[in-house]
Amino acid sequence: MSIRVLIVEDQSMVLGALAALLEIERDFEVVGQARNGEEALALIAASKPDVVMTDIEMPAMTGLELAAEIQRRRLPVRVIIVTTFARAGYLRRALDAGVTGYLLKDSPSATLAGAVRRVHAGGRAIDPELAGEVWTEPDPLTDRERQVLRMAGDGASSADIAGRLKLSEGTVRNYLSEAMNKLGAANRTEAARIARMKGWL
């Protein structure tokens, strides 16, 4: 019986390449391709995949948000992240979201296929270089600080953030100030840059 795989990737060339690699394997069936997490959630219901293979950075809904939503809904699907981001912070957040596979896009195709089989069988498949780093530096940010800092890093003003999150501007400034202090940053832009570099946003 084939392992049913749904691929989620916003770059068409990478999406096609991953699908082609998996289709070569006799025991895999690519049952769907999505450009973001929102599309993927709709396809999960329709195509009933065993494994979702997703990128992290995508519009509409990131791979980490998709994994967290799959976990929240208790969908019977295993999630593998395939990304260019070799950051322990991302891996830690992925594990917290119930992800059981985390590989880098430059991994050999045999590693990718083996990871799908291992995860489908109930195991884990984590990039060995990242696995050793994952608990070395804990993420100091709260969920709300992360949310506010991500929006600020994307250029939103305190007023914009307050409006979108239904908070007061003073509360938004407090969250940003806390995040800056925790990261040792001089301003919100630097704080967002540091947090992104460490994989915390």
Give the role of each language-model region.
Residues 2-14, 18-22:
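Conserved acidic segment of CheY-like receiver
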Residues 89-147, 200:
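Short, flexible helix-to-coil linker/hinge segments that flank and couple to helix-turn-helix
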Residues 58:
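Receiver (REC) domain active-site loop signature in two-component systems and cognate sites
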Residues 47-53:
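Active-site beta3 strand of CheY-like receiver
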Residues 27-35, 43, 185:
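Short hydrophobic/Thr-rich beta-strand motif most characteristic of the beta2 strand and flanking loop
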Residues 55, 83:
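Active-site residues of response regulator receiver
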Residues 36-39, 62-65:
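Acidic catalytic/metal-coordinating carboxylates
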Residues 157-190:
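Recognition helix of helix-turn-helix DNA-binding domains
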